[in-house]
């Protein structure tokens, strides 16, 4: 996992379910964000929930596997701080 993915996982660990727009604030490039979200979803670390409203909203949250990994990363981050 690269730093952008780690940043996403730690953000979700802290905030819970988040909207795409919440995550977009973490990145200068939405392309980078979209690629990382797709990779994390394929690895089954996050799940996406789409609400068919106007405008359509996408929500992301950690899977159990994602929570486990994010918790470990958070411990490492605390150790290094």
Summary of predicted features, one role per range:
Residues 54-73:
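Basic, amphipathic "hinge/linker" alpha-helix immediately C-terminal to the N-terminal HTH DNA-binding motif
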Residues 24-56:
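Canonical helix-turn-helix DNA-binding module
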Residues 3, 42-45, 62:
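N-terminal leader segment of winged-helix/HTH proteins
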Residues 72-81:
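Alpha-helical linker/hinge and terminal dimerization helices associated
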Residues 1-31:
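N-terminal helix-turn-helix DNA-binding core of bacterial DNA-binding proteins
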């Amino acid at each position: 996992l690269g730093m952008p993915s780690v940043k996403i996982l730690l953000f979700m660990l802290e905030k819970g379910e988040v909207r795409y727009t919440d995550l977009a604030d973490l990145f200068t490039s939405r392309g980078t964000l979209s690629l990382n979200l797709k990779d994390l979803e394929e690895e089954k670390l996050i799940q996406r929930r789409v609400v068919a409203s106007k405008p359509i909203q996408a929500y992301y949250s950690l899977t159990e596997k994602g929570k486990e990994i994010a918790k470990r990363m958070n411990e490492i981050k605390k150790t290094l701080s």
